[in-house]
Amino acid sequence: MNKIRKGDEVVVIAGRDKGKRGKVNRVQKDGKLVVSGVNMVKRHTKPNPMLGTAGGIVEKEAPIQASNVAIFNSATDKPDRIGFKILEDGKKVRIFKSTNELVDN
C-alpha cells in the first residue's frame, strides 16, 4: 500500500520547487510522482503533420522523487506524514501522523 496516491494534495519539501503545492497526477512504479505545476521542464518537439501537431517548445511536468514531497493536511494547513491503521473490520487505512485522522474519507 503506497503512502502517496493519485489525487492526493502534496507539498514539495526539497529541491528547486520547495514549498509548491499540487495534486498527484500519476504514481510511477519506480517511486516517482508527477505533480501538477511542479518540476516543469521544457521539451523541444518536432512538428508532426500526420498527427496535426505543431512543433515548438512545450512545457510539461516531469516526475519528482516521492521522498521530496509530503502530503498536505488541510486540517492543520501544513505538510504531514502518513501512517497506517487497521480498523475493526480489518480494513487497512491511511492516517495523518499529527492528528490521527483518516486521509481517505
Curated annotation (Swiss-Prot):
Record GO cellular component, one term: ribosome
In its UniProt record, a GO molecular function of this protein is: structural constituent of ribosome
Q: Output the Pfam families linked to this UniProt entry.
A: KOW (PF00467), ribosomal_L24 (PF17136)
Q: Which UniProt keywords apply?
A: Ribonucleoprotein, Ribosomal protein, RNA-binding, rRNA-binding
Against InterPro entries, the record matches this protein to: KOW, Rib_uL2_dom2, Ribosomal_uL24, Ribosomal_uL24_CS, Ribosomal_uL24_KOW, Translation_prot_SH3-like_sf
What's a GO biological-process term for it?
A: translation
What is the annotated role of this protein in its UniProt record? One of two assembly initiator proteins, it binds directly to the 5'-end of the 23S rRNA, where it nucleates assembly of the 50S subunit.
> Which family, according to the similarity comment?
Belongs to the universal ribosomal protein uL24 family.
Which NCBIfam families does this chain map to? rplX_bact
Q: How does it assemble?
A: Part of the 50S ribosomal subunit.
Name of the protein in question? Large ribosomal subunit protein uL24
Q: Which organism was this protein described from?
A: Hahella chejuensis (strain KCTC 2396)
